[in-house]
Amino acid sequence: MNRIALGLHYDGAAFSGWQSQPHRNTVQDHLENAIERFAGVRLLTTVAGRTDTGVHALGQVIHLDTALEREPFSWVRGVNAFLPPSIALQWALPVDQGFHARFLAFERMYYYALYTGPHRVPLVHGRAGYQMLPPGQRLDVDAMREAAACLLGEHDFSAFRAAECQAKSPVKTMYDVTIRDDGNWVFLRFRASAFLHHMVRNLMGCLVAVGRGRYPAHWLAQVLAGRERKLAAPTFMPDGLYLVGVKYPDPYQIPAADPSASLFHGVFDDAA
């Protein structure tokens, strides 16, 4: 039996999240149907991170087991022929049976693209979050950065956890929160050992609230320490959220994600 790792991009705007559900339009169902048409047999996939409805991926990783003998690019070309335009494999890589897309991952990275201003921009609808601000007003990005500093390190992130979260522990390690602004755009990068359900979107709600001046920067540390979801801001919209990267031990040589063909082109190129 051969184990294959696959890299996947998708525009999540039209899908009910990653995970297969009866009578729902999910990324997993479309992918497994396409794989079946290519391989001639139903093959189950294991994913690095189950994204929610409306969330996108530039660096999703899956694995599957198969008896088929195919060249790596044959998987990419063949499966893509049966996928809708909003989903595409980027690479395929043979791996040993020790590889596991979910359990072997030691770091995950999400980006968020946020547009601010007095009116929405239809051309990025579904692909960027939006915060209405009066003409001439901007988010206080410096305050947002100050607030985000408390998130670094190992913490109990229960305050940012969805009620339906199935993670065994709320304790995660946040390695980095980088915030960049460019006119009406604000881009955020979150790197952590793993994320709880809705964790990034709940953090976004809090950071935007700080940026709007509704709370001081030190408020976020109080929310974190309180460990109660009711203390935090409402969950922010999924539209601008992208799973950009998943890291694995070096021997597996899993390709890094390439965000160049997205809203994030060049935004974090000089960030560590």
UniProtKB/Swiss-Prot annotation:
Pfam families reported for this sequence: PseudoU_synth_1 (PF01416)
Ranges in a coiled coil: none
Organism name: Cupriavidus necator (strain ATCC 17699 / DSM 428 / KCTC 22496 / NCIMB 10442 / H16 / Stanier 337) (Ralstonia eutropha)
Family from the record: Belongs to the tRNA pseudouridine synthase TruA family.
Name this polypeptide is given: tRNA pseudouridine synthase A
NCBIfam families in UniProt: hisT_truA
General function of this protein: Formation of pseudouridine at positions 38, 39 and 40 in the anticodon stem and loop of transfer RNAs.
Reactions catalysed: uridine(38/39/40) in tRNA = pseudouridine(38/39/40) in tRNA
Catalytic activity, EC: 5.4.99.12
Active site: D52 (nucleophile)
Subunit record text: Homodimer.
InterPro entries associated with the record: PsdUridine_synth_cat_dom_sf, PsdUridine_synth_TruA, PsdUridine_synth_TruA_a/b_dom, PsdUridine_synth_TruA_C, TruA/RsuA/RluB/E/F_N
SUPFAM superfamilies, sorted: Pseudouridine synthase (SSF55120)
Residues noted as binding substrate in the record, renumbered to the chain: Y110
Keywords from the named record: Isomerase, tRNA processing
Molecular function GO labels: RNA binding; tRNA pseudouridine(38-40) synthase activity
CDD domains: PseudoU_synth_EcTruA
GO biological process: tRNA pseudouridine synthesis
